[in-house]
Every structure is written in structure tokens, then in C-alpha cells.
Curated annotation (Swiss-Prot):
Listed InterPro entries: Mdm12 (IPR027532), MMM1_dom (IPR019411), SMP_LBD (IPR031468)
Compositional bias annotation for Basic and acidic residues: 81-96, 268-279
Region (Disordered): 62-113, 180-279, 356-376
Domains (record comment): The SMP-LTD domain is a barrel-like domain that can bind various types of glycerophospholipids in its interior and mediate their transfer between two adjacent bilayers.
Stretches assigned to the SMP-LTD domain: 1-433
Protein's UniProt name: Mitochondrial distribution and morphology protein 12
Main location: mitochondrion
Compositional bias ranges of the Polar residues kind: 214-236
Assembly description: Component of the ER-mitochondria encounter structure (ERMES) or MDM complex, composed of MMM1, MDM10, MDM12 and MDM34. A MMM1 homodimer associates with one molecule of MDM12 on each side in a pairwise head-to-tail manner, and the SMP-LTD domains of MMM1 and MDM12 generate a continuous hydrophobic tunnel for phospholipid trafficking.
Membrane topology according to the record: Peripheral membrane protein
Keywords associated with the record: Endoplasmic reticulum, Lipid transport, Lipid-binding, Membrane, Mitochondrion, Mitochondrion outer membrane, Transport
Family, similarity comment: Belongs to the MDM12 family.
Source organism of this protein record: Ajellomyces capsulatus (strain NAm1 / WU24) (Darling's disease fungus)
One Gene Ontology molecular-function label: lipid binding
Amino acid sequence: MSIDIDWERATSGPDGELLAERIRSFIHDKFQQIVLPRFIRSVQVTSFNFGTIPPELEIRDLSDPFPDFFEDDDENFSDSSEERSPTREPVDRYGNRVDSWQANSPGGPGGQMYGRVGFNQPLRMPEWEEHTGISPLRGPMNFGDINPYLFPRSGTPGIPGGTSNLGYYMPLSGLSNSQTPLGAVARGNPFSGGWPDAHGARPSRRRSEAEPDSAQSRPSTANTGNTLPSRDSMSVSDPHHCHASQGMSNNQGQVLEPNIPPTSPNHPLDDTPPRRMREQKAEDFQVFCRTKYAGNISLSLTAEILLDYPMPSFVGLPLKLNITGLTFDAVAVIAYIRRRIHFCFLSPDDADTLMGPETAAGSGGGDTLEPNSPRRKHSSLLREIRVESEIGRKENGKQALKNVGKLEKFVLEQVRRIFEEEFVYPSFWTFLI
């Protein structure tokens, strides 16, 4: 079933301009956190425009929402409070009042829909994990007053602009490297008898910082739930620990067994609390929607190319890059769970697992890829990005022209990386309505 979108009405007017400015500011902030190559300086995102061509949407399937969408990490916005006092002033997780914002949006009942846009609070880390040096590579999308439930911006040493989880969720079910994030979901109903136990005591998985010298490397995930606490992290007041130490010192030839019960893989030695899951209700549902886009969305960036002749960083040439359009084809997931809408895209592997392999369509021509082909599995959801570059003082010669190509390649890689890390499952966005 196809869906028609009034693209002009949705992206124009004061609300559309405000949303475009928020997206521009978000992309700009992400570029400020990237380690730039030596020959590039001062990347600025100057404008963003939705264009005039709408995407093509086709509903492919309906199902129960993913288990991750039921995780309740918002202490001040519970389901019971939503039903009893829907007009309560929004507060953050520390109890501080935040400004609310309401706007009229088209498409709702009667042509108007009153809603608020926001994001979940960041996941809590256990105390021993806060000292491991692992920091999430997340940056807040600064929606300002448009999002009363925005992540609080937290300053992190060593990362400009601070970091935030930004409604970002890693696969927290302990999957192996050979499985896709949705492999377990495809094998059966996520709400089978064993699902709460599997998610109740599973270790947390977090994303670590990427290598600073590799612009296109993706952060890796590491299972920190089963990691034993270090020797220094044990408190000297622990009776079991003191008993074991005294026994070893008083009997050098004999090692006494400490009075610590044996641990099992199901009970790791950490203080990570189990996830609080919302109860599934009959009205909760999830839509799989095929999304195709080949429009004229535009994004403008400015930067400086440094020339190394006659000395390193001798002069900087201003450069303007214009992304004039892109081609996009993916499966979107939209879940509705009691005044919350969760949104994300599926990777090609996950889309094939849930939706089944698709044959190449004749209308796609040579750009349509078989889902099981190696090229499809390792390609980006952004099939094509069209770029136009303008450089000042072209009389500087080959040195400038050579680095223009490098800069274009660098910018396109970063745009793809930002999109995949922020919008592809297991990352997802939550909107409060």
C-alpha cells in the first residue's frame, strides 16, 4: 500500500524552516567532533533544504514492536503518569523543569495534530564502568525548545561539545559477531515466554570511541557485562575480600578458599540493574515501510584547504561544497507505543532477514542490487550523493585541485557515517506525541 505525502506542506512554513535549521545545526555539531585531515580546516555547515521532491513510501508489513522499543529508561515519564496527568510539566531525569513546545502539524485527525518531539534519556552506566574510559560516540541533535525531552548535554573531557546517547541504543542481547541485530527477532515472536528473562539480566553493550586517525572507521561494541571488577575496585571493607587476604598472609604455604559463592554466566559481578520494560498492550504496533528517495535535498558546507607550498599550511583556500541531491532506498520501521513513536531504518541484512529477499526490479535498472550479493551487503543505504564544489582563487594551480577531490571524498564519507550511526537500527529515534 502506497502513501502520498504533502511534502510542500510538511517542509514549508515556520515549522519547516525551524526543523531545517535544527537539522543543519545537528550536522554542523557532528562535523565539529570529527578529527579533520591535515589539509582541511574549519568545516562549517551553512544551510540545509528539504527540496521539492517527496520520498516514495510503501507499507510492506505490520508486526509487534521490537523489544528495545519497550525499554523504559525515563524515570519521570512513566506510563501511569501519562494516563493520569497528560498536562504535567515536563522535567528531566534530575527533576529540573524544561520548557515545553507545541506546534500544529498537518496529517492528524481533522487536519491538525498537536504534538511534542523529544528523545529518551541516556542509559545509566554502573559506577565501575564510568572509570573504564569508554565514552559513547553520540552527539546531541540540538532541537532546543522544540524538544522538551531532549537529552541533557553532558560535558565529557577530551570530546569537544560533549556527548550524549541521543536516543541511541546498542544491541543489548549479547549477540555474536555472526548475527545481525535482528536475527533473534526473525526466528520468532519477541514476546515469547523466554524473552523477559533473556533481556532482564543481559549485560550492557556500549559503543567505544573511534580511532582518531581513521575517519571512516566505525566504533566497535564490547561486552562489558561479564567483565570482572579489577583488584583495585574491590572495597577493603568487603568481608569476603578481607577474609581471603588474611588467609593468604597467615598461611603462606596454604591458600584458603574465600567465602565467595561461585559465579555463573547468568549472574555477572556487576551492579548493572535489569532493564525496566514497559508492558505490551494490544494497541502497540509496528509498521515496515519501503522508502525510496531520489530528490533534490540540498546541504551546503564551507571549508578551507591548506596549501603546503612553500611551507606547511602556508595559505588556506576557501572551498564551498553543495550536496545537490541523493538517492536512497531502505526499509523504515515506525513503531507506535502509547504516546511514543520510534523510528529507524534497517540495514540491508536486517531487511532481508525480516522482509525476505527481493528480486531485482526492472524499474531500478543497473542500480538495483540483489539483496544477497556482496555489494548489497556492504553498501551504504545512501546509494548516490551528488556534490558540486566551488573553490576560490583557482589560479593557485594543481595543489588546490588535487585536494578538492580529497575533501569531497572525506565529506561524503562523513555524511554516510553520520546517517548510518544515527538512523540505522539498533540506533533509533523516539518522538513524544
